[in-house]
Amino acid sequence: MQQLTEIVEQALVIIDQASDLKALDDIRVDYLGKKGKITDMMKMMGSLSPEEKPAFGQAVNDAKQAIQQKLTERIDGLKSSELEAKLIAEKIDVTLPGRTQENGGLHPVTRTIERIETFFGELGFSVKQGPEIEDDFHNFDALNISEHHPARADHDTFYFNPKLMLRTQTSGVQIRTMETEKPPLRIISPGRVYRNDYDQTHTPMFHQVEGLLVDEHVNFAELKGILHDFLRNFFEEDLQVRFRPSYFPFTEPSAEVDVMGKNGKWLEVLGCGMVHPNVLRSVGIDPEKYSGFAFGMGVERLTMLRYGVNDLRAFFENDLRFLKQFK
């Protein structure tokens, strides 16, 4: 009995000294497990007389309960302490000011595309999209761009192979639309385009919006009127606008469109012209019956002019100090 009493006293002291749940579990195994000290004491009953066994068995059972109760109390105490420490660590000071969530804003390029889509949408133009990886027919051939035209050169175009490339303009969307839909057509095609160029006013990827109208009896005067109205609407000013004769393989006649800047100088903003008969023929449209006009504009350039941005690369650098100005 003396040995049993010593085991219990020793266990209670060790339990009080345990600092974590792992240590308590080790103590439980050491004293109450299958090979524990209390279990070993139970095995001694085989050597006792029948008269001694009841008292010894009761003593062992009391010892086991005492150790188990002490373990339970200590486990509950440690869990309570851990919870209290966790609550203190995670305590929220409700007197502190709240953290407001900043509202995001549209990127200036996105804003410009939306303004363009809204204006032309009110004139009955629908928005069309197309693949950014284009074949040479839709990117060049159908647009009346000859095999030896400089635009096809490796230093201007990103080629995957001689017949497949990153599109250099969204005009391919116009070709695909004319292949699948019959006139009358009024579409604009905004999207990313790619050219091998990088400096203060050029990036390898930029955004373009091109427009196309095909119908009977379409003329250049209609084109001029629409673009005049668009530019005055976009810049929200009664701008001076001029059309300069130019050359594009896919339009004839062709023109560059300029606006008068605040410094008194003309600034080029877009290109346009009447759709070349060869372009209409390439998609199975009779140029004797139908005519059309097309125009194209660089979104970043328009955005730079509207907001007074000097370096096009700022649109792609994700500098919040810059982007927050357009919220």
Swiss-Prot record:
EC top class named in words: ligase
Recorded superkingdom: Bacteria
Listed GO CC annotations: cytoplasm
Cofactor: Mg(2+)
EC number assigned by the record: 6.1.1.20
Record keywords, A-Z: Aminoacyl-tRNA synthetase, ATP-binding, Cytoplasm, Ligase, Magnesium, Metal-binding, Nucleotide-binding, Protein biosynthesis
Catalytic reactions of this protein: tRNA(Phe) + L-phenylalanine + ATP = L-phenylalanyl-tRNA(Phe) + AMP + diphosphate + H(+)
Cofactor remark: Binds 2 magnesium ions per tetramer.
Residues annotated for Mg(2+) binding in this entry: E252
GO molecular function, one term: tRNA binding
Subcellular location field: Cytoplasm
An annotated GO BP: phenylalanyl-tRNA aminoacylation
InterPro entries per record: aa-tRNA-synth_II, aa-tRNA-synth_II/BPL/LPL, Phe-tRNA-synth_IIc_asu, Phe-tRNA_ligase_II_N, Phe_tRNA_ligase_alpha1_bac, Phenylalanyl-tRNA_Synthase, tRNA-bd_arm
Family designation: Belongs to the class-II aminoacyl-tRNA synthetase family. Phe-tRNA synthetase alpha subunit type 1 subfamily.
Subunit details: Tetramer of two alpha and two beta subunits.
Protein name: Phenylalanine--tRNA ligase alpha subunit
Organism: Shewanella sp. (strain W3-18-1)
